[in-house]
Amino acid sequence: MNLRVLWLLSIAQFLSMQVWFNFSAIMPLVQEQWQLSSTQSGIIVATFHLGYVLAVIFYSFASDKYNPKYSFAYGSLVAGISGLLFAAFAEGFWSAMILRLLSGIGIAGVYVPGMKMVAQLSPPASRGKAMGIFVGSLVVGSGFSLFVSGVLQNAWGWQGVILVTSCAAILSCALILMSKIPVVSLSSTPVTLALLKKIVAKKNLLVNFGYAGHCWELYAMWAWIGPFMVYFYQQKGIADALTWGNLSASSIVMIGGIATYFGGMLSDRWGNVRAIRLFILLSIACSFSIGWMLLAPIWLVVAVALLYGFTIIADSPIYNKAIADITDPEVLGVALGVQSVLGFSFTIISPAVFGLFLDHGNWGVAFTVIALGTLITPFCMRALQAAEVPLERS
């Protein structure tokens, strides 16, 4: 793949994805200002994912028929404008929920069309590495909004954080529209029942349900790791815990930018199932433990959190690569869309479930519930191996 194109798409996605978790970055501030419960905050986070799921199938079909560059650009624009409206008009639970729904609809136009371009422009031998770089830009972009919050919140307030991150998404739109990106293969073949059966074949379903378990854990953790670190530092008596909590959370999320490259590269060498199993078991172990560590030393909690941030995302590009490896090119956009819908349907639930158990339990219970839901993924990987389903083309 042309490295210039790969880095162009990755930089554009980095800019767009700052919208994804900018609400999580300001959550401790608006919870206090708007008198939100943890359950309500989790629902606002989940509403973004609902918008994503509602829109992603449309974008997936469109990316198989039309140049996905334009889905990417206009999705970024919608995400950015909805963020500007959030900064100007959000004043409570309902307005925040509606505007975050619009942001999710916009971001749906970025990830799957971008992944289709990367998958089809990459040779199979290095596809895992290329997709790892692209997913890494999602990770770093998502985490960067936490960094922006840590730096700007005291001077500019939560509105300033939303404003800066939303303008980044609008800049992404301009960057894509002004750039020359090779046109990937577009399908003139109608989507038939026979083609759809390939998308829902056993091997696809096992990969996709494994991905769903991964998404359940990942997006609950990403949504709540900032508030968790803020709370942890408050319990330790750290001055300006809000700033340090968000800065720590940004490091925890952004370390995943390295992890996705490493995970993609490892899948090229080890195979998909083996690489997924390594990372998912480590991240589940972190989910089971971190919420119960509030009395542990700061250095130990930060170390476990960094391991958590690395392992929880390292396998993410591998699920995308696995689908790309086993899917006919003419329906790749739809296949990636189906995977995304299934995975992100779980993310509509998990942040809200986390908030519910946090309201009625504690951090340990909330993280443990997330870990239990993630156990579906190693079971799916075991089923794939037992059935000897090949996940790489020979």
Per-region residue spans from a language model:
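Conserved MFS/SLC helix-loop-helix module at the cytosolic interface between two early adjacent transmembrane helices
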Residues: 54-90
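Cytoplasmic helix-loop-helix junction between adjacent transmembrane helices
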Residues: 99-137
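Extracytoplasmic gate region of multi-pass secondary transporters
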Residues: 23-24, 205-257
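Residue-level signature of mid-helix packing/kink "hotspots" within the transmembrane helices
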Residues: 21, 49-57, 142-143, 253-261, ...
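Helix-loop-helix hairpin linking two adjacent transmembrane segments in secondary transporters
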Residues: 133-177
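Cytoplasmic membrane-interface "Motif A"-like loop-to-helix N-cap segments
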Residues: 65-75, 268-281
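C-terminal ends and interior cores of transmembrane alpha-helices
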Residues: 77-91, 282-295
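C-terminal transmembrane helical hairpin of 12-TM major facilitator-type secondary transporters
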Residues: 271-319
